[in-house]
């Protein structure tokens, strides 16, 4: 969609027609000399809209303004079109910034702008609004409780307090801070009004709710009094149709902004929410939240304007809501004014073009003051027209400023900065333009001479308005000395150059047309004649674009022949379809050039078909039409239709009608599709040279729904809790749902029964149903079968399976339960097997004496085991233990409770190794005796582990002594671990490393020195 344009031109008219020499003055609106390097103010920072929190502790606010200028600018501020009184102590200036101390809403709220000026003029900044933000607390009154029947929908009102600005965010607390409600398909918090909506209330919703409101602009949050929500239990919750209660309104938004639409419905079951743009595709930047209740359109554009619809649906009915989005646009420059220098007495065309929606208006400022509205026309500029100009484009949604300085020039012609070239080359028979560009104001008159001959316009010679001289059909006689004369009312000047005639450049061997197949090579010849005094270069272009041989990717396919100076042959290697087109060879010198072209035809697989459209969408088929793509010079033999579903990223060939799509066809059907499935389609063309690129994929479509035709598999079940019949099956995957409101019908009857009992399971992802019946006989055989259904009908039943209802829990308790205390942390429990056949496992429950029985730990073992080990127990602690027999229906009665005590903890002190001495072929390791503490088990001996360093396994020794002899290691180092042993278990380890090398480790020295008082050094 194109936006309307507004065009405004500025043309300046002089009040005087002639001027003599002048003296430069420094006040607004005067011209400048050639040497003048100053310039008017250019804004680098301008004030922006600012919100000052009323409760801020900072005590000041700053509005920024900074301009670049020479000489430095002077700043001034205005508020609501009145001057800011800088003599007031509350106002101060820092550079160009305005600082307001102790801001007061009554005195300081308003619209501000900054003026920056120097002797070249004055400019005015964009306007900025200073506002005061606040968020009042919620009222202190208690909020009444809300009672709702389970299964019904409800809304809790937030009713936010007074505030500014309106950019609030809302969340809801549940019972305490910071536990926030998580939004899902059933619960929704509107960011428009803050209300909490629940599609249907459940017992788990019971609690106290508080609306939590945040203002990001002033970084403040408040929350309401808690609202008690009390769900009222219902024996059966009744379904009711979808009812949209959160509706979006017609909105006007700005192009480039993000737009949020909210739509939420009450209903039981929870309604599904779908979004669409009526009669048009959804914007590519649109995103739908996980719950479906929020549609966000990012960076909205004019083409996204239109009617949007949300639809809520459940098994009981649907509801729809529509509203329109209107997209407006801030003013935006198409072309704006820039700093300009013009000659005195000339006209100025200064375009100022803006676009926007609605159409912006144009107004002008000169030196900070209103100058004109709309188009401004003046002619024959004077010094009074110099100054700082601002073009302002504005509509209802904002304004934009374009600033520029206008300087008026007046000086006699001079060639000092841009003299004529001393030597100009031109080819015989060609054309030459000799430039003459002096600096002068006003624009001078031009005349030319060759030698002593004055030149006048003719069929071959033309003097341009800008002073340039054009000569056509050049001959040798045109060589010579040329002089350009420039004159205005302030003086005159001239400049001279020499024209030298060269031989022309000509193509003498032109490229010729070529026809090849993809992957082959082609050669384009090119040779030229040229003036030997000049250098010749060849330039190749492809379809009008110069080939850059310096690019690495170019070397793959293009190569030039550099063997001969006058030869520019081009080799095209491994040609691809993209290399087909027109190749042009240009032979050029600094004087002239000559070109010749030829066409390269590359035959290959077809290009992608275009214009793919989907029509006649049905449950298992769609009709496709497309337009023929390029055959790349080889006739198309057939087309292939490919599909991709939402469940896969892979494209697959589709079955079609007709099965073979001939190359002259542009329509066909894709058949054997999955009903109610989202598909994308594309078409691929094939010829004798291969298969081409696929078409652009179609828009995603959904096939019509149909009744399921696949039965659930793996139907079975059984087991479970007493008086239950558990039926299981493998849920059908999404591709077999075939329609909306998908679920299962479960049928079952006693094995010898006549009448099937049927129940409906609405959860499409479940594979389990449990039927409870207090009159059901345990371990009774049932026949069961399952079928799928959707809103289009029922599918076939599965094969009948035979399962048993849950058996009774065991009725006997294990007997002869006994325990054996193994250590401070382990107890062994044993019992006599229960003779009932229905026992599948045993459960041991145990708890410490200081704990409640409800906190008991459990250990489960199979029915073939008659003992179990309890580990990780507390030392020196009373424990209670009981054993029960269990099966899938539960556990039977427990045995009598056994009381026992764990032993005291093992010694906590490690043995202190006092020596490790080599004696012959053995090491003698000696340690101090470990004395147990009063709350530890008495030491009964020591365990020594002799193992290779880096390994965990080794040889274990036991002793009642305080030393042990171990063999000298043959290879590497060994570790000797020593620990005390007691009835409570093993104590803490001490260790020492030994090896076959006769040295004493530094770690061992630290052990020996304090106890022995001297260094023992042994050498064997």
Curated annotation (Swiss-Prot):
Glycosylation-annotated residues: 208, 258, 338, 457, 473, 494, 521, 593, 935
Keyword check for Membrane: yes
Keywords associated with the record: Cell adhesion, Cell membrane, Disulfide bond, Glycoprotein, GPI-anchor, Immunoglobulin domain, Lipoprotein, Membrane, Notch signaling pathway, Repeat, Signal
CDD domains linked to this entry: FN3, Ig2_Contactin-2-like, Ig5_Contactin-1, Ig6_Contactin, IgI_1_Contactin-1, IgI_3_Contactin-1
GO CC field: glutamatergic synapse; myelin sheath; plasma membrane; postsynaptic membrane; presynaptic membrane; side of membrane; synapse
Tissue: Expressed in the ovary and in Sertoli cells of the testis.
Propeptide: 1002-1020
Short name of any one Pfam family annotated for the protein: Ig_3
Lipid positions (GPI-anchor amidated serine): 1001
Disulphide linkage map: 65-114, 158-211, 263-310, 352-391, 436-484, 526-585
GO MF term list: carbohydrate binding
Localization (cell): Cell membrane
Superkingdom of the organism of origin: Eukaryota
Signal peptide: 1-20
A GO biological-process term: cerebellum development
Disordered: annotated segments: 695-719
Residue ranges constituting the Fibronectin type-III domain according to the UniProt record: 608-706, 711-808, 813-908, 909-1002
Membrane-topology annotation of the record: Lipid-anchor; GPI-anchor
Family assignment from sequence similarity: Belongs to the immunoglobulin superfamily. Contactin family.
Assembly information from the UniProt record: Monomer. Interacts with CNTNAP1 in cis form. Binds to the carbonic-anhydrase like domain of PTPRZ1. Interacts with NOTCH1 and TNR. Detected in a complex with NRCAM and PTPRB. Interacts with TASOR.
Known role: Contactins mediate cell surface interactions during nervous system development. Involved in the formation of paranodal axo-glial junctions in myelinated peripheral nerves and in the signaling between axons and myelinating glial cells via its association with CNTNAP1. Participates in oligodendrocytes generation by acting as a ligand of NOTCH1. Its association with NOTCH1 promotes NOTCH1 activation through the released notch intracellular domain (NICD) and subsequent translocation to the nucleus. Interaction with TNR induces a repulsion of neurons and an inhibition of neurite outgrowth.
Miscellaneous section: F3 shares with L1, N-CAM, MAG, and other cell adhesion molecules from nervous tissue the L2/HNK-1 carbohydrate epitope.
Name under which the protein is recorded: Contactin-1
Species this chain originates from: Mus musculus
């Amino acid at each position: 969609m194109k936006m309307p344009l507004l065009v405004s031109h500025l043309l300046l008219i002089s009040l005087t027609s002639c001027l003599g020499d002048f003296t430069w003055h420094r006040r607004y609106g005067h011209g400048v000399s050639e040497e003048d390097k100053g310039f008017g103010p250019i804004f680098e920072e301008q004030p922006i809209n600012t919100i000052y929190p009323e409760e801020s502790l900072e005590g000041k606010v700053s509005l920024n303004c900074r301009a670049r200028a020479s000489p430095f600018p002077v700043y001034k501020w205005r508020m609501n079109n009145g001057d800011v009184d800088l003599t007031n102590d509350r106002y101060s200036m820092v550079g160009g910034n305005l600082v307001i101390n102790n801001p007061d809403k009554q005195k300081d709220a308003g619209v501000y702008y900054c003026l920056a000026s120097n002797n070249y003029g004055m400019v005015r900044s964009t306007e900025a609004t200073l506002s005061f933000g606040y968020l009042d607390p919620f009222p202190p009154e208690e909020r009444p409780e809300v009672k709702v029947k389970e299964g019904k929908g409800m809304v809790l009102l937030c009713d936010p307090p007074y505030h500014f600005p309106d950019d609030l965010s809302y969340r809801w607390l549940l019972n305490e801070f910071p536990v926030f409600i998580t939004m899902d398909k059933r619960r929704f918090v509107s960011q428009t009004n803050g209300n909490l909506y629940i599609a249907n209330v459940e017992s788990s919703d019971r609690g106290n709710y508080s609306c939590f409101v945040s203002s990001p602009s002033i970084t403040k949050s408040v929350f309401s009094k808690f609202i008690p929500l009390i769900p009222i239990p219902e024996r059966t919750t009744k379904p009711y149709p979808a009812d949209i209660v959160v509706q979006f309104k017609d909105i006007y938004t700005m192009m480039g902004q993000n737009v949020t639409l909210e739509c939420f419905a009450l209903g039981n079951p929870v309604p599904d929410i779908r979004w669409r743009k009526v009669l048009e595709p959804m914007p590519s930047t649109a995103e739908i939240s996980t719950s479906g209740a929020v549609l966000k359109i990012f960076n909205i554009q004019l083409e996204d304007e239109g009617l949007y619809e949300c639809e809520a649906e459940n098994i009981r009915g649907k509801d729809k809501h529509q509203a329109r989005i209107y997209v407006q646009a801030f003013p935006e420059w198409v072309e704006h004014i820039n700093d300009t220098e013009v000659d005195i007495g000339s006209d100025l065309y200064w375009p100022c073009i803006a676009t926007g929606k609605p159409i912006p208006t144009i107004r002008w400022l000169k030196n900070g003051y209103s100058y004109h509205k709309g188009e401004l026309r003046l002619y024959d500029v004077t010094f009074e027209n110099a100054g700082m100009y601002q073009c302002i484009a504005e509509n209802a949604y904002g304004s934009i400023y374009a600033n520029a300085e206008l300087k008026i020039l007046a000086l006699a012609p001079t060639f000092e900065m841009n003299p004529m070239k001393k030597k100009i080359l031109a080819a015989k028979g060609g054309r030459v333009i000799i430039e003459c560009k002096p600096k002068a104001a006003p624009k001078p008159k031009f005349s030319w001479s060759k030698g002593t001959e004055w030149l006048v316009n003719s069929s071959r010679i033309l003097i341009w308005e800008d002073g340039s001289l054009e000569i056509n059909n050049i001959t040798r006689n045109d060589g010579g000395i040329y002089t350009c004369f420039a004159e205005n009312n302030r003086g005159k000047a001239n400049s001279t150059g020499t024209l030298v005639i060269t031989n022309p450049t000509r193509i003498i061997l032109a490229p010729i047309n070529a026809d090849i197949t993809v992957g082959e090579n082609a050669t384009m010849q090119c040779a030229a004649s040229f003036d030997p005094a000049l250098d010749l270069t060849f330039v190749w272009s492809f379809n009008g674009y110069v080939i850059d041989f310096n690019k690495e990717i170019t070397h793959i396919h293009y190569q030039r022949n550099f063997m001969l100076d006058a030869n520019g042959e081009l080799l095209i290697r491994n040609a691809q379809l993209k290399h087909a087109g027109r190749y042009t060879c240009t032979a050029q010198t600094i004087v002239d050039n000559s070109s010749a072209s030829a066409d390269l035809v590359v035959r290959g697989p077809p290009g992608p078909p275009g214009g793919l459209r989907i029509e006649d969408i049905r449950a298992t088929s769609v009709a496709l039409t497309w337009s023929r793509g390029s055959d790349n010079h080889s006739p198309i033999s057939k087309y292939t239709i490919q599909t991709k579903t939402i469940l896969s990223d892979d494209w697959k060939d589709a079955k079609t009608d007709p099965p073979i799509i001939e190359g002259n066809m542009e329509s066909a059907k894709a058949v054997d599709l999955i009903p109610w499935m989202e598909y994308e389609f594309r078409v691929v063309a094939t010829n004798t040279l291969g298969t081409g690129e696929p078409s652009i994929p179609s828009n995603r479509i959904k096939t019509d729904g149909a009744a399921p035709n696949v039965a659930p598999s793996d139907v079975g079940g059984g087991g479970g809790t007493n008086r239950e019949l558990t039926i299981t099956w493998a849920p059908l995957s999404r591709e077999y749902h075939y329609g909306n409101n998908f679920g299962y019908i479960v049928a079952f009857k006693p094995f010898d029964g006549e009448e099937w009992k049927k129940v409906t399971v609405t959860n499409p992802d479940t594979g389990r149903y449990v039927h409870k019946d207090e009159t059901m006989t345990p371990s009774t055989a049932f026949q069961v079968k399952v079928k799928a259904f959707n809103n289009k009908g029922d599918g076939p039943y599965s094969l009948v399976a035979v399962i048993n209802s849950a058996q009774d829990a065991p009725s006997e308790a294990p007997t002869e339960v006994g325990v054996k205390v193994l250590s401070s942390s382990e107890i062994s429990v044993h019992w006599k097997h229960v003779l009932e056949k229905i026992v599948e496992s045993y459960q041991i429950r145990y708890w410490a004496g200081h704990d409640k029985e409800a906190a008991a730990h459990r250990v489960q073992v199979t029915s073939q085991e008659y003992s179990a080990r309890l580990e990780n127990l507390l030392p020196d602690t009373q424990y209670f233990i009981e054993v029960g027999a269990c099966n899938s229906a539960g556990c039977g009665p427990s045995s009598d409770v056994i009381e026992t005590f764990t032993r005291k903890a093992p010694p906590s002190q490690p043995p202190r190794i006092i020596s490790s001495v080599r004696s012959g072929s053995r090491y003698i390791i000696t340690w101090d005796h470990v004395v147990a503490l009063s709350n530890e088990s008495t030491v009964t001996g020591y365990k020594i582990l002799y193992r290779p360093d880096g390994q965990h396994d080794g040889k274990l020794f036991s002793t009642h002594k305080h030393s042990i002899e171990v063999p000298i290691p043959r290879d590497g180092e060994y570790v000797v671990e020593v620990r005390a042993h007691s009835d409570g278990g093993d104590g803490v380890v001490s260790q020492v490393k030994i090896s076959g090398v006769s040295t004493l480790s530094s770690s061992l020295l630290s052990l020996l020195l304090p106890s022995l008082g001297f260094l023992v050094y042994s050498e064997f």
